[in-house]
């Protein structure tokens, strides 16, 4: 009889324990996935600026030890920019302008980045006042954001699927209006990248560009790239 009661109590404890998956469990699981050696994702980014709406096709490649390659393709004019970070620095390659730029920058760690998983996870972890809920089988975080160059952006809603993959992120103003929306279409946590994939020459060759270097005396002497990481200082410009 005692054994029967013991097993009944054990079953109740186990059943009670099930379903108590909370935000800390989710954060831990996301951290394990994102901290792996690499990932690749694709998605669509919509940016609202006053009466203008810009849509970008986004592709992000990440390899451990601070290697990032981000492609932003403007859907309206088919112009692409590639942000590259490796051991040599931060670069922006702009094929439409036949130029590449090298910057002194802490990118992507100096502010929020809606299309980088590490950045979004850091926003979640660093916000002690974050809100968390479960809705329609998905998990939803609401956190503060850090966009020093755009004070209109104050918070974000992060939707994560039941499979623990990022689904959609809305960056909101103080009235709760979405000014940036990132829809994730594909996330691969076990990608394979070709050799030298994160080297500048490889990026320039893939964009069919020449490797001609031009020294720049001041920012005014250069044509600014369409996408400029926050907190950057131009140090070099190359004709591509």
Describe each model-derived feature in a short phrase.
Residues 14-67, 128-131, 212-217, 221-233, ...:
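N-terminal leader/targeting segments and the immediate start of mature chains
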Residues 49-52, 77, 148-152:
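Short, cysteine-centered beta-strand-loop-beta hairpins and adjacent loop/turn segments enriched
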Residues 1-16:
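Sec-dependent bacterial lipoprotein signal peptides
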Residues 136-205, 209:
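Gly/Pro-enriched, hydrophobic low-complexity segments
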Residues 34-38, 61-69, 84-89, 135-136, ...:
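Short, solvent-exposed coil/turn segments at beta-strand boundaries
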Residues 87-154, 215, 228:
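Flexible, processing/modification-adjacent segments and terminal tails
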Residues 61-115, 177-181:
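An acidic-aromatic
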Residues 45-47, 72-74, 92-96, 145, ...:
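Beta-turn initiation residues at beta-strand->coil junctions
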């Amino acid at each position: 009889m005692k054994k029967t009661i013991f097993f009944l109590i054990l079953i109740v404890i186990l059943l009670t324990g099930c379903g108590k998956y909370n935000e800390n469990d989710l954060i831990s699981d996301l951290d394990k996935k994102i901290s792996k050696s690499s990932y690749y994702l694709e998605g669509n980014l919509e940016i609202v600026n006053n009466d203008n709406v810009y849509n970008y096709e986004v592709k992000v490649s990440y390899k451990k030890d601070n290697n990032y390659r981000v492609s932003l393709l403007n859907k309206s004019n088919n112009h692409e920019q590639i942000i590259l970070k490796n051991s040599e620095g931060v670069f922006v390659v702009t094929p439409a302008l036949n130029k590449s730029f090298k910057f002194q920058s802490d990118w992507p760690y100096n502010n929020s980045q809606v299309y980088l998983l590490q950045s979004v996870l850091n926003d979640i972890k660093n916000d002690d006042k974050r809100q968390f809920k479960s809705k329609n089988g998905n998990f939803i975080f609401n956190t503060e954001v850090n966009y020093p160059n755009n004070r209109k952006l104050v918070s974000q809603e992060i939707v994560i699927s039941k499979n623990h993959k990022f689904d959609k992120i809305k960056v909101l103003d103080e009235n709760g209006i979405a000014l940036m929306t990132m829809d994730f279409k594909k996330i691969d946590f076990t990608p394979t990248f070709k050799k030298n994939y994160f080297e500048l020459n490889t990026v320039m060759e893939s964009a069919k560009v020449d490797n001609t270097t031009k020294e720049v005396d001041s920012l005014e002497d250069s044509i600014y790239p369409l996408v400029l990481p926050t907190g950057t200082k131009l140090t070099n410009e190359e004709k591509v």
